[in-house]
Structure formats: structure tokens, C-alpha cells
Amino acid sequence: LLASESCALDIVGATVVRDVEPGEMLIIDKNGIRSEMPFQQVAPRFCVFEYVYFSRPDSIVEGRGVYHARKAIGGELASESHIDADLIIPVPDSGVPAALGYAEKSGVPFDLGIIRNHYVGRTFIQPTQKGRTDSVKLKHNANPAAVKGKRIVLVDDSIVRGTTSRKIVTMMRNAGAAEVHMRIASPPTTHPCFYG
């Protein structure tokens, strides 16, 4: 059984044996399974976005649990960029582990100030700006009871286009937050990645 993420193997009760190496082909046929490396070997180009966003939190990437990596990044973010606040709020769902790590490290309470509609997909891949903006409106809704009058820190995993961030900040202000601060758990995405 082969899968792109370890969590798929967990779900069916399979055991993770090893990762498929960059450029490797695993051939499974009537004679069994064999590995071939038909391409010139190059240095691996690990995509940091696997830890930040793409992988499911319950997967293992390069021997490390994605959830724990994201939570540790949030803790580091709190150490580097602390601000006095009343509440730490994740941008769901991908911002949750980093926000938990931020809250634990800072000692500021964690709460769900944004409720996510799980029937709306990834907003940053919509082909038009209007589509992205409309998707954000459908995907997230404020929880005014949690944020009204509070100084909040929003924690998200990344910013690709900024559409979600702008809308979420406005949403929190409209819900009555006294202050809205944004913390991002990864460096800015400024250029495309050509490594796949």
C-alpha cells in the first residue's frame, strides 16, 4: 500500500515502512515490489509548506509529527512576537496547532473566536479574487460572544494572497474586538516554488 501521507496508512491500519525518496519509482507487479532510481540524483528540496499547510496534522513528515511541529512553531512565535492580549484565536482549521502553541507559551487563554464552515474548500486556490473573497465569507464566521471587548491575537499558519487575513481582521473588528493583532506561523510566501 502506497500513500502520499502517513495518516492514510493509519486510517486503514497499515504500517509506515519508509518514505519514497525524491526521484524514486516503486514498481509493484506480479514479481513483487522493487525500487528504481531512473533519474540523476539531486539534493532533496523539502517543501516547508508540508509542515505549514499541505499535510494533515495527523501525518508524519520526515520522521516528525506535523501537529507537534505546528504547535512548536506557534510556541516559538509567541517567544519571538509576544503582545499583551486577552485571547489567542486560531484562523481555523490550519491555524489551530500554532495558536495552541502560542497560547501555551504566552499563558494567554485560547478560544474559538472564528467558526469555520467545513463545507467550503481552500480559498487561496480559487481562480479569481472575487471567488476567493466570496469563499472567505462563506468559510468563516465570527463568534462575537468570544471576542467582544477583547484584545485578541489571531494566529494563522501562512499568508499566500492575504485575502483571508484582511477579511478575518475586518470580521473581528465588526464583532467588537477591542484590538486585533495578527501573527503568522511561517515566513511570507513571496515567490512560486518550482520544485513541485
Explain the meaning of each model-derived region:
Residues L1-G196:
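PRPP-associated nucleotide enzymes
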